[in-house]
Amino acid sequence: MAKTESPKISPIKSSDSKKGFSKRVVRWTSVSIVSAIMTLGAWAFASPIGSTPDDDYHLVSIWCGQGFRDGICEEGSEPREVVVRETLMEYPFCYAFNPDDTATCKQTEEFAPTTRSNGGENPRIFYWVMSWFASNDLTASVISIRFFNSILIVLGFAAVTFALPRHLRRVPVVSAVSIALPLGLFILPSTNPSAWGVYAVVLFFSALLGFVLTKDRRSRWILGPIALATLLMSAGSRPDSALYTLVAIAAVIIITFTRKMITPVNLSIAAALLLMGAIFLFGSANTSATLTGAPGGGLTTFTGGQLYANIINLPTLWVGGFGVWGLGWLDTAMSPIVWVVGWGVFLSLLFSAIMYFNLQQGLSVSLIFAALIFVPLLALSASGLLVGQFVQPRYLTGLLGMLIAAAMFRTSMNSGPLMSRAQVWIIGFALVFAHIVALRTNMGRYLTGMSEVAENLDYGFEWWWVDRPASGELFWFSPNLVWITGSVAFAVFLVSLWKLRAELGLPGYNEWTKETASVGSSATAPKKRKTTTPKKVLLTKKAKPRKKT
């Protein structure tokens, strides 16, 4: 949308400083990017081939994403039938739904026919992009896809954060961290379309928000293409994510709206974005399942009692991604410490921001929250199904991230929620500990099964990517190495965010201090915030001095 000026919203240019980046900022930015990729890399190795829900369908769809190719995806004898490596279809089912079974499955060279692949039910963009990594070496292909998705999303967040005005940089950063544990970290480095569906919609919201508000031309040239690319990623991965892009567009319009924005250029851009999202949404056969329920349905008659049951049980879908529901094929149960920390951090961020909402921000957040309620209820009610059937938490995790993104919006550096150093460090330590537990639990489920808790992941395992060296080498690509590396990398990532708190405008950054920001919209220290008491909380009026008589 064309840049606008508003008396209520004061965009800050993202390149006011001519000093450029300081060595400290470059160093910690590099550390944050590398540590984020290393964390996701550990999760990429933490589970075997086909470990996300419906991966038999998604893997075949990826291998056939470019149509028929000799030795990759061949034409079958029946309509919609394709012939692919049997391992793509059968490998997940040697351990799926049986948490006590390890992933000791054999890969075969044989090909077999199947009709379980994408025939237009889902958008084709995700499968087409991932299909470039498809080969006869299934292990190398799957790991390559997982790392590609990890690097793509991390660099996307880095680019958006760099281009945003400093007072908006907390929007993508805080929202990404808030939904990371554990589902976000598990699903992003995977072959599941939700790898894009969860985080790309948050990126789209953040990039579009910055594009509307920033006045800096260079930033707009970065944010505009990213907004377009992430719209294609979101809408091109899942039909429900296409619906969420429409919600994101509406939320951005509400939160930034002024009368000066009503111009032919802005209206054209908004209409074009809405049209693109709608094309992907209604161009997929599974859209009927997203809006009107699962094919085949469940209950023949859906009563008010079932609707009431869905309403009161709906929050389990919101908290499911924080560990209440299992990972993998929903069969890897997490320790309560994981979801208590994840959901607790999410709620603390949301509630700390509510008191700073203006009317527009409140309406924008309310729109996203309404989508969290009515989208799953509509799908379940139309299908005659109950909470726990058909709709999974990963379908809503992107909306939860967008909810935090909208809540973190602020109009300037002198607005929005703050947190003390103690609060931030408590959150940081809790996230690090919960992440250690989540990663180890996920690895242990496939190494030894959930019935056994190994004291040492390097011993007694039945599955791993490589065999244990017979010579007893001290350093090798072991499960413990992956677990420790991923745990340390996540802790380093959070520390790097703390070190960049001034540049990122994070809630833990105290605007009263004299810290300087060497990057972005404001290179000088922000002015001291006025400590005025809101009129609404004044209980008494200041007594006037009496006149002497």
Sequence positions of predicted segments:
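Start-transfer (signal-anchor) and selected internal transmembrane alpha helices
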Residues: M1-A42, V265-L273, Q423-G428, V488-T533, ...
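Interfacial juxtamembrane loops and adjacent helix segments
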Residues: G67-T139
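Membrane-lumen/periplasm interface segments of multi-pass, membrane-embedded glycan/lipid transferases
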Residues: V129, T263-A270, A278-Y356, F461-S487, ...
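Transmembrane-helix motifs of polytopic, lipid-linked glycan transferases
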Residues: W132, S144-L168
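Membrane-interface alpha helices of multi-pass inner-membrane proteins
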Residues: F186, I222-P239, Y244-A250, E473
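Short acidic/glycine- and proline-prone juxtamembrane loop motifs at membrane-interface regions
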Residues: S190-G197
